[in-house]
Curated annotation (Swiss-Prot):
Protein name: Citrate synthase
Molecular function as annotated in GO: citrate (Si)-synthase activity
Gene Ontology cellular component terms for the protein in this record: cytoplasm
Transmembrane segments: none
Keyword Transferase: yes
Active-site residues, as the UniProt record annotates them: H314, D372
């Protein structure tokens, strides 16, 4: 199938082939648009531009659907662990059985330790340095320790690179946190599961099982591990978002893969991307009380007020974000099973959602809750500090970045990314 482009100035007609998709709309192949017509396409923000063909994840914004390699996100969250999803994203296959799942997870556990020299680098940062700045730097430094990943040729090379960074990113994030608060570094405990280890390194005390709560001392519960596991799965990948596209763009230059991942971390830092869940919680704090919700909703509608309601709306989803639905259910489940929630903030969030889902202003603009709206409330209940919400996002998303990077570098169509511009200067 082809599409005809007509130049109305001279009535010249140009034929462009279309590219079929297995899900979603077709694409018109404009790769030779300039060569054929003398024109560039102009698409600020690339909202109508496909920069690649991918088999990793698919988002149906109208229907509110998300798939990882053909599997519905609802099924993956319900039936599989995060490490199984990691294997799916990196290899295209879920574990066939428990033994295969454990084998993959044990590899991640054993690769989770980091070179001691990194500790000196982290200690050199000011104590108030943002953890995302430190984490991005730490991943970049990893490229100096594993220089062989600069030249990958076999599938084993690719998988080693990806699994190494997926294994180490929780350790780096935990070091960033404990360095900031002045607590001793806790090394990975390979006897713990991959996900439990993350909570242990963030929350635990040295040389002992976790003892942290405001009401008596209890260890990490299986319920907490399960909840955190689901959060990581929900954040593992999301098609060509800003950070994933950044990873692909930087990787296209031939740079060390960990430098590309570092760039992805920097992109995720922004409050319009990964930093949004932190902003949601801070905004709920600002609202302060259920009785103030109407006032803030009115501010959203006021054309003279720049106030924006965080956690609502999405560039792709024009319906309820499926990840937000899962997180809302998870929040309710945790509350019912006795996990302590911030009742005040939960009530404010529920009231905001109740009003927004019925208000014509939000409905007309397709402003529905997104993944950030409830994730912060749950992370706080899991005793994750607010400043470390975005690093948690990094932990979950690193495997998706690796999958995107590998898909790009292994593609015979891969080229250095070089967008055009419409010059309007003197």
């Amino acid at each position: 199938m082809s599409v005809t482009l007509v130049n109305n100035e001279n009535n010249e007609r140009y034929e462009f082939e279309t590219i079929e998709s297995t899900r979603g709309p077709k694409a018109v192949d404009f790769s030779k648009l300039f060569e054929t017509t003398g024109f560039f396409s102009y698409d600020p923000g690339y909202s109508s531009t496909a920069g690649c063909q991918s088999k990793i994840s698919y988002v149906n914004g109208k229907k509110g659907e998300l798939y990882y390699r053909g599997h519905r996100i609802e099924d993956l969250v319900a039936k599989y662990k995060y490490v199984d999803v990691c294997k799916l994203l990196l290899t295209g296959e879920l574990p066939k059985n428990q033994d295969e799942s454990l084998e993959f997870e044990l590899e991640l556990r054993h690769r989770s330790f980091v070179h001691e020299s990194l500790l000196n680098m982290f200690s050199a940062f000011p104590s108030n340095a943002h953890p995302m700045a430190k984490l991005s730097s730490g991943v970049s430094i990893l490229s100096t320790l594993y220089s062989t990943h600069q030249n990958m040729h076999t599938e084993e090379d690719y998988q080693t690179m990806a699994r190494r960074i997926v294994a180490k990113i929780p350790t780096l994030a935990a070091i960033c946190y404990r360095n900031e608060v002045g607590a001793p570094i806790i090394y990975p405990d390979i006897a713990r599961s991959y996900v439990e280890n993350i909570l242990f390194m963030l929350r635990g005390y040295p040389y002992s099982r976790l003892k942290h709560t405001t009401q008596g001392e209890v260890e990490i519960t299986p319920l907490e591990v399960e909840a955190f596991d689901k959060i990581l799965t929900l954040h593992a990948d999301h098609s060509q978002n800003a950070s994933s596209t950044t990873v692909r763009n930087v990787a296209s230059t031939g740079v060390h893969p960990y430098a590309a991942i570092s760039a992805g971390i920097s992109a995720l830092w922004g409050h319009l991307h990964g930093g949004a869940n932190e902003k949601v919680l801070l905004q709920l704090e600002e609202i302060g009380d259920v009785k103030n919700v109407d006032k803030y909703i009115a501010r959203v509608k006021d054309k003279n007020d720049n106030f924006k309601l965080m956690g609502f709306g999405h560039r792709v989803y024009k319906s309820y974000d499926p990840r937000a639905k899962i997180l809302k259910g998870l929040k309710d489940e945790l509350h019912q099973k006795g996990v302590k929630m911030d009742e005040r903030l939960s009530e404010i969030a529920a009231k905001v959602e109740e009003i927004a889902l019925k208000d014509e202003y939000f409905i007309e603009r397709n402003l529905y809750p997104n993944v950030d709206f409830y994730s912060g409330t749950i992370l706080r209940a899991l005793k994750i500090p607010v400043r470390f919400f975005t690093p948690v996002f990094v932990i979950g998303r690193t495997v998706g970045w690796c999958a995107q990077l590998l898909e790009h570098v292994k593609s015979p169509q891969a080229r250095i990314t070089r967008p055009r511009q419409v010059y309007v200067g003197d």
